[in-house]
């Protein structure tokens, strides 16, 4: 089972404060573990423009049609001071990894320097921090019914309003997660 380019959708019974009602986009999954970015937990009072200001990056030439007031996500509990930018191709940046044909993750400053300009990738999600699972840990959490999985959908990743991503991700697999009981059993 390889869940790269899939969503993990927190089951209603998952009460961990970071992962409760979360949707995690899995960037890497192999025999050594998994790494992902939470895509629906906005950091309070932090938008892309605030990150650019803190890093003293001024978009030039600025394209006023591109919004920089989008929320920055809490990507996970690890390395919360480190930025991860999920975006659509191209992957011409210094530190980019292609996750799928349509999704790239970049951790280098050069992608930030394109935000707000015509060179910016068409779709962008900025996160601080990431989530990680050791070898076999994610598989065990799946067996314990902590998560649902669904193939990733770019509309949910980049365009669906943040507050609706949990429910919309579950709908990908035909589930209205708001009607699920808090605890699921094994079939």
Swiss-Prot record:
A Pfam family the protein falls into: DUF179
Domain of life: Bacteria
UniProt organism field: Salmonella newport (strain SL254)
Gene transcribed to yield this protein: yqgE
NCBIfam families assigned to the protein according to its UniProt record, in alphabetical order: PRK00228.1-1 (NF001266)
HAMAP family per UniProt: UPF0301
Annotated family: Belongs to the UPF0301 (AlgH) family.
An annotated GO cellular component: cytosol
Name of the protein in question: UPF0301 protein YqgE
């Amino acid at each position: 089972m390889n869940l790269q380019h899939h969503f993990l959708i927190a089951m209603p019974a998952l009460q961990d404060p970071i992962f409760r009602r979360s949707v995690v986009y899995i960037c890497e999954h192999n025999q050594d573990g998994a790494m992902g970015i939470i895509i629906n937990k906005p950091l309070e009072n932090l938008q892309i423009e605030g990150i650019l200001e803190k890093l003293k990056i001024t978009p030039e030439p600025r394209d006023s049609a591109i919004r920089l007031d989008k929320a920055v996500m809490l990507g996970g509990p690890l390395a919360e001071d480190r930025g991860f930018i999920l975006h659509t191709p191209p992957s011409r940046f210094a530190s980019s990894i292609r996750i799928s044909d349509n999704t790239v993750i970049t951790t280098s400053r050069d992608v930030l320097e394109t935000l707000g300009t015509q060179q910016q990738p068409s779709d962008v999600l900025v996160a601080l921090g990431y989530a990680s699972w050791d070898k076999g840990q994610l598989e065990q959490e799946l067996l314990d019914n902590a998560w649902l999985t669904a193939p990733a959908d770019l509309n949910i990743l980049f365009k669906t309003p943040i507050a609706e991503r949990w429910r919309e991700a579950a709908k990908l697999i035909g589930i209205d997660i708001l009607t699920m009981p808090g605890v699921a059993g094994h079939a």
